[in-house]
Amino acid sequence: MDTHVRGTIRGAIDLMRIGNAVAAGVLTFTGAFVAGGFAVTTAHVTGAVAATIFATAAGNAINDYFDRAIDKINRPMRPIPRGAISERGAIVFSGFLFVAAVVSTSVLPLIAIVLALMNLLALVAYTELFKGLPGVGNAIVAYLTGSTFLFGAAAIGRITDFGVVVLFILAALATATREIIKDIEDLDGDRKEGLQTLPIVIGVTPAYRVATGVLLVAVIASIVPYVIGIFGIWYLTLVVPADMIMLIGVWQAPDNPTQGQQLLKRGMFVAAAAFVVGRAVVVAGI
């Protein structure tokens, strides 16, 4: 295999951001488990997880295509700016991944398929229309991230499970916080491209205050399952540290936005683990 082919394959792999795609699949599985415990249908959950991974990878690829000019400034080592994959190649590859995602949904209940189609439309709308609008792009990304949990629950026919709904809200709010901080980090490149992100429109300090306020709502929401008795003390022992990690992340964000984003992401995954443990304890009768 020659160097050019290896470089293209590496570029395609980087374009998918496999770590993020697999993480989204894990969140979908988490949603199914929180909603149904151990009584889940393997084929449905597998289809939902596969669809999430393919759709997330496709979304990353198409997002990089539309962001190719901005990434020359903000992230020059991404596959398209560094020349690892062509613009046309990125479009074709993302189309292949979207088809794989659609095929994966064929085993799912109708409600899950409808949710998948809604998310696909939201993703396309985000990349082509709303990404540069203040708050709107952040809200769409927040919804899409949180909806991975709903999708897992929908795959087993339990999309209205209260625990999953709270998890959706928590993840969406935490993601909104992270997206605003990311916009602060990308301020220079976004301004040069004429985007109207929240920090550009209202200023960095007000945007940071909005991000902090949104996260505080998420922290309050995370306690609700314990307060109303859905999950017990084992849930609380994990979700409180998760909240602390996210709060530290937003506190560090003004001085180190990259570190703040990483802590917010880690805190969200710890919170997801808290929901898994909370459901497992209930199912086991501990």
UniProtKB/Swiss-Prot annotation:
Pfam families (UniProt xref): UbiA (PF01040)
Compartments in which it is found: Cell membrane
Q: How does it sit in the membrane?
A: Multi-pass membrane protein
Reactions catalysed = sn-3-O-(geranylgeranyl)glycerol 1-phosphate + (2E,6E,10E)-geranylgeranyl diphosphate = 2,3-bis-O-(geranylgeranyl)-sn-glycerol 1-phosphate + diphosphate
Pathway(s) of this molecule: Membrane lipid metabolism; glycerophospholipid metabolism
Is Transferase one of the keywords?
yes
UniProt-listed Gene3D superfamilies: UbiA prenyltransferase
EC primary class = transferase
Sorted UniProt keywords: Cell membrane, Lipid biosynthesis, Lipid metabolism, Magnesium, Membrane, Phospholipid biosynthesis, Phospholipid metabolism, Transferase, Transmembrane, Transmembrane helix
Q: Which cysteines are joined by disulfide bonds?
A: none
Which parts pass through the membrane? 21-41, 42-62, 96-116, 133-155, 162-181, 214-234, 235-255, 266-286
InterPro entries this protein is in?
Answer: DGGGP_synth, Prenyltransferase_related, UbiA_prenyltransferase, UbiA_sf
Does the keyword section mention DNA-binding?
A: no
Name of the protein this chain belongs to: Digeranylgeranylglyceryl phosphate synthase
- Source organism per UniProt: Haloquadratum walsbyi (strain DSM 16790 / HBSQ001)
